[in-house]
């Protein structure tokens, strides 16, 4: 699950009334890929057709909206997770690159003096361990949860370089990853369910 809170200050210009739009995110992703680094994307709703119009340079894309009638708003779980770790995204990205393809799960552990991302397969194992000098750790007890590597990797790889990531963790609970974009004008929160091993 992902939740984004974007203020108008994150945009070069912004004008809108209260409204609800249903978007096909795969189509939106395709439009965003058309933009080069630093290129401006203009997005506006065409009142005559009801479509969302994207302009990227000389390209114009008109996109049909999804009818949201009857769609339930996803409820974001309110979790009070025990451990909070603030770590540079570069450390997480190195750890993910190291553990990929070793096992079908990644273990995240944290204690008062450490944060660890590890993975153990049939023949190989690897871990990234950070102390309080490399990460800001806040927890009174040790916590541990396992997660599917492909989903966690996709989240971590999508976070821009130079970003500080707030990781909230507990025993066999979802992990929450929170980070800011656009000089703090936008906040992104990812929530990933744990992998629970059957006894």
Positions of the model-derived regions?
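DNA polymerase sliding clamps and clamp-related checkpoint/processivity subunits
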Residues: 1-101, 109-199
């Amino acid at each position: 699950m992902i939740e984004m809170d974007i203020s108008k200050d994150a945009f070069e210009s912004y004008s809108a009334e209260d409204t609800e739009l249903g978007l096909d995110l795969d189509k939106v992703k395709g439009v965003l890929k058309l933009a080069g680094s630093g290129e401006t994307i203009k997005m506006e709703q065409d009142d005559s057709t009801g479509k969302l119009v994207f302009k990227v340079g000389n390209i114009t894309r008109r996109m049909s909206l999804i009818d949201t009638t009857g769609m339930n708003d996803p409820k974001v779980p309110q979790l009070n997770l025990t451990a909070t770790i603030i770590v540079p995204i570069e450390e997480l990205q190195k750890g993910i690159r190291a553990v990929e393809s070793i096992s079908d799960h990644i273990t995240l552990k944290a204690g008062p003096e450490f944060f660890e991302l590890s993975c153990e397969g049939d023949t190989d194992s690897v871990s990234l361990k950070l102390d309080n000098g490399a990460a800001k750790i806040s927890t009174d007890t040790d916590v541990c949860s396992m997660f599917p590597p492909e989903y966690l990797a996709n989240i971590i790889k999508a976070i821009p370089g130079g970003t500080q990531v707030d990781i909230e963790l507990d025993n066999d609970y979802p992990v929450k990853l929170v980070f800011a974009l656009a000089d703090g004008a936008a906040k992104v929160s990812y929530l990933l369910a744990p992998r629970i091993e059957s006894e």
